[in-house]
From Swiss-Prot:
This is SH2 domain-containing adapter protein B. Phosphorylated upon PDGFRA, PDGFRB, TCR, IL2 receptor, FGFR1 or VEGFR2 activation. PANTHER family: HEAVYWEIGHT, ISOFORM A, SH2 DOMAIN-CONTAINING ADAPTER PROTEIN B. Residues 1-103, 144-178, 229-385 are annotated as: Disordered. It is found in: Cytoplasm; Cell membrane. Interacts with PTPN11. Interacts with phosphorylated 'Tyr-720' of the ligand-activated receptor PDGFRA via its SH2 domain. Interacts with the ligand-activated receptors PDGFRB, FGFR1, KDR/VEGFR2, IL2RB and IL2RG. Interacts with EPS8 and V-SRC. Interacts with GRB2 and GRAP. Interacts with CD3Z. Interacts with tyrosine-phosphorylated LAT upon T-cell antigen receptor activation. Interacts with PLCG1. Interacts with ZAP70, LCP2/SLP-76, VAV1 and GRAP2. Interacts with JAK1 and JAK3. Interacts with PTK2/FAK1. Interacts with CRK/CrKII. Interacts with IRS2. Keywords: Angiogenesis, Apoptosis, Cell membrane, Cytoplasm, Developmental protein, Differentiation, Isopeptide bond, Membrane, Phosphoprotein, SH2 domain, Ubl conjugation.
Length: 509
């Protein structure tokens, strides 16, 4: 007895305590509605579905109204509680399945049209029983409005009004053996002996591939009927025909693909054709190379007489091996500069390039000709214009100290400092020229282009000697001074890193 009390009254144990139960509902209002004789029978499904949409205490009243059994009254209920419940039903009305929703009215109209147009005398009773059963199932589970709509759509005749687009399926007949899931292609096949007795099975056994989302039930029936009329014979082969844009399933036969592969394909075959052409071209080139003689560097130590008999090969091969040795090679020495795969016969472009290089090496350089042409035959200087390429002088010119100053190409005579700077302005660093000094008649000036501008150094004559600046050793002539500092640094402050590299061989016109 103590265990029973502890279990059912939860004495001293808060974990097993049951949740509070809702109060007993009032069924007097539902009894009054059900006992009215003037109420049409078609309104009962609406009332039951409306009751199934409501939650809380209305679920039990829905069940009692649909089943026809009414429980006993628990006592009188005040008008305040009835008004509160009516207001609660209006406030918490389901927007989809409530009594005033447009979707509910549309479903009721479609249900009546479907049951009336079915051609069966008991269509209204079937619809009523189905809706009442669905309403009872929804109320017993205490489902919401969405759950009641889903349960009613499973038994009603118009599924497209109750299911979403992702849940819709074509209304396939019962004779189809397999139902394809969503976004799948299934080849429907029947048993071996079911071709004559079952028209739909025989039609679907013909290898029709269909998708439930792409084609509807009527389209499937039309295809099955057409295939049954075409393939009535039992000995015809199955043909796989794709009914939509999906790819073939893994179990479909590749008869059409194999037949199409045997013929000439109309696809993109240019890479294969190009490869075939290149293979043919390489084969022709190999045939040509076989007809030619063996190149010198391909097999240097093997005999050339491959077609000689075995008796005479032993006597010929030592001589041929000796002739192929490098010391017996009679080719010129420059032939070894080229790699072994560069052959002048096989690569004419490279042969022309090498021939051009040899001609260029054998011919005199244009700089030497230009140096020779700078001096006139009479010993004078060749006048050169300002824009000519010889304006900046000759790079790395060697100065001959035995030549007199007047015949040197870098001597410009009596020109002013400004003219010398104008000539050096167009030249690079370490360019120089020698001119007469403007302050002393017997002295000379060395004008030099540096990275900071122009420098003018005096070549003073002291006791028959010439000195550059103040720290240079004495020289007998000006060409000796220039020749000495072409290979050494200048002893001038600010030009310690400079040498006389580029003489300016330009005369003013």
């Amino acid at each position: 007895m103590a265990k029973w009390l502890n279990k059912y009254f939860s004495l001293g144990n808060s974990k097993t305590k049951s949740p509070p139960q809702p109060p007993r509902p009032d069924y007097r209002e539902q009894r009054r509605r059900g006992e009215r004789p003037s109420q049409p029978p078609q309104a009962v499904p609406q009332a039951s579905s409306a009751a199934s949409a409501s939650c809380g205490p209305a679920t039990a009243s829905c069940f009692s109204a649909s089943s026809g059994s009414l429980p006993d009254d628990s006592g009188s209920t005040s008008d305040l509680i009835r008004a509160y419940r009516a207001q609660k039903e209006r406030d918490f009305e389901d927007p989809y399945n409530g009594p005033g929703s447009s979707l509910r009215k549309l479903r009721a109209m479609c249900r009546l049209d479907y049951c009336g147009g079915s051609g069966e005398p008991g269509g209204v009773q079937r619809a009523f029983s189905a809706s009442s059963a669905s309403g009872a199932a929804g109320c017993c589970c205490a489902s919401s409005g969405a759950g009641a709509a889903a349960s009613s759509s499973s038994s009603s005749g118009s599924p497209h009004l109750y299911r979403s687009s992702s849940e819709r399926r074509p209304a396939t007949p019962a004779e189809v053996r397999y139902i394809s899931p969503k976004h799948r292609l299934i080849k429907v096949e029947s048993a071996a002996g079911g071709g004559a007795g079952d028209p739909l099975g025989g039609a679907c056994a013909g290898g029709r591939t269909w998708s439930p989302t792409a084609c509807g039930g009527k389209k499937l029936l039309n295809k099955c009927a057409a295939s049954a009329a075409e393939e009535s014979g039992a000995g015809k082969k199955d043909k796989v025909t794709i009914a939509d844009d999906y790819s073939d399933p893994f179990d479909a036969k590749n008869d059409l693909k194999s037949k199409a592969g045997k013929g000439e394909s109309a696809g993109y075959m240019e890479p294969y054709e190009a490869q075939r052409i290149m293979t043919e071209f390489q084969r022709q080139e190999s045939v040509r190379s076989q007809h030619k003689g063996i190149q010198l560097y391909d097999t240097p130590y093997e005999p050339e007489g491959q077609s000689v008999d075995s008796d005479s090969e032993s006597t010929v091969s030592p001589r041929l091996r000796e002739s192929k040795l490098p010391q017996d090679d009679d080719r010129p020495a420059d032939e070894y500069d080229q790699p072994w795969e560069w052959n002048r016969v096989t690569i004419p472009a490279l042969a022309a390039q090498f021939n051009g290089n040899e001609k260029r090496q054998s011919s005199p350089s244009p700089s030497r000709d230009r140096r020779r042409q700078l001096r006139a035959p009479g010993g004078g200087f060749k006048p050169i214009k300002h824009g000519s390429p010889e304006f900046c002088g000759i790079l790395g010119e060697r100065v001959d100290p035995a030549v007199p100053l007047e015949k040197q190409i870098w001597y410009h005579g009596a020109i002013s400092r400004g003219d010398a700077e104008n000539l050096l302005r167009l030249c690079k660093e370490c360019s120089y020229l020698v001119r007469n000094s403007q302050t002393s008649k017997h002295d000379y000036s060395l004008s030099l282009r540096s990275n900071q501008g122009f420098m003018h150094m005096k070549l003073a004559k002291t006791k028959e000697k010439y000195v550059l600046g103040q720290n240079s050793p004495p020289f007998d002539s000006v060409p000796e001074v220039i020749h000495y500092y072409t290979t050494r640094k200048l002893p001038i402050k600010g030009a310690e890193h400079l040498s006389l590299l580029y003489p300016v061989a330009v005369r003013t016109l």
